[in-house]
Amino acid sequence: MALKKVKGNFERMFDKNLTDLVRGIRNNKDNESKYIAQCMEEIKVELRQDNIAVKANAVAKLTYLQMLGYDISWAIFNIIEVMSSNKFTYKRIGYLAASQSFHADSELLMLTTNMIRKDLNAQNQYEAGLALSGLSCFISHDLARDLANDIMTLMSSTKPYLRMKAVLMMYKVFLRYPEALRPAFPKLKEKLEDPDPGVQSAAVNVVCELARKNPKNYLSLAPVFFKLMTTSTNNWMLIKIIKLFGLMTQYEPDIGRKITQSLIDLICRYN
């Protein structure tokens, strides 16, 4: 009888999901620290199980606890295990935990390189998109160097969803690994005239952010931006472009004269 009771308690522990954790914390306001400490011990037991569903459930709970300020860096290897799952539902939980708890100096981050590369090259666009979104939160110099070519390849994807994410991700790559900018520049310029407005906006955003540091390097793109300014109806993008021209006029005063009439037309259009 005692053995059956212990077994029942053990099985019930694995039945606790994120909803149960949140409910339990709310019901134990007077003893919150003690309750969470108990939950942490249960989660550690769950992470030692072979069942990936149990591990994913444990990582989901850890992610919530991390949002409350608890350190979960000790579970980095378990998070990587869930990230590598073949099931998208579990993989998404792993990447969410990684995006919240990993950082560029995280130990064992080097173990994720091949796994992320595999996800970036997945047939399922949402798996590749998930990898791009997660990577943007914890990319390191080594990851940027090793995965730059894979991300550049996605800039030419047939799927606008991936092209847009890849363009935005390249900005993070440039910050960590500036050497990637030169080989990626032709593709980035090409995306400024992408047929998809989302991809085009992403490219404008990336170039404008890069130009804030050194506008002179992007003077060659002035004709492309002038064309966008006179044809686009995206107000957000127009504001970005006008600010960019403002930076460029420091190095090429003629730009101010050339865009004056277009600026007047824009003001009249929205007046």
Language-model-derived ranges and their functions:
Residues 2-83, 87-271:
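Extended alpha-solenoid helical-repeat scaffolds
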